[in-house]
């Protein structure tokens, strides 16, 4: 395939490839596990993560988008490299735009969701919960008078469990008491999640974007070290707004301009 030489060619190229998407994989080596977006192959001493073009929402695969897998995988690769001073990660090699070879890890059954703004449209989003009258969420106290899409006084960690059918919000206290993680591991991971998010916000703002919220996953490698895994700061795992127009749109009671999969969530 020919390379895209400038951003003005993106739309044209995507249109030509609309029927040429990576929907599924089938390799003879390794034990295959199929996720909503990624296919994972467990090899002898590592795993191969193949990011497809599948588009998911509300735990369902809805469609496919040309080059989506490449965007997600290469975005993660960039951020993994830029954040390794905060926490090591599972990446061994990026042999293809859609593929990451990674360390085998024992994954913590908790997703570390960090939020900088009160927003969202799903049943577990901070705004939905707040608008329904709750003033405590995942162990965080919420003040009266917050408005949708408002910046929080400080970044907030709202963890969820990783369960087969549906994740559920959980407090740090319950994470430890229910045995999801040890207190020591939780303290370390929660600290790193907040550090990663602060760095992500700073970097995004330098590039004209607001990193609104995101999720991280972590696990222990074969040496017992805690590492960052899965993906980081992608349009699938994160919410991004355009910084330049944010204040004016809030003043005019308009939704912020977003560049993530929130549009598909709202549509559904």
PLM-predicted stretches and their roles:
Residues 2-10:
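Metal- and O2-centered redox machinery and metal/ROS homeostasis
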Residues 9, 14-160:
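Active-site loop/lid in soluble adenylation, ligation, and acyl-transfer enzymes
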Residues 39, 215-217:
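Short, surface-exposed charged micro-motifs
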Residues 107-109, 207-211, 222-226:
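Coil-to-beta-strand transition motifs
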Residues 151-183:
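A short mid-domain helix/strand-loop element embedded in enzyme catalytic domains
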Residues 181-212:
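A long amphipathic alpha-helix within ATP-dependent nucleotide-binding catalytic cores
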Residues 217-258:
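Catalytic activation segment of kinase domains across protein kinase-like and atypical kinase folds
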Residues 266-268:
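Conserved small/polar residues in nucleotide/adenosyl-binding loops
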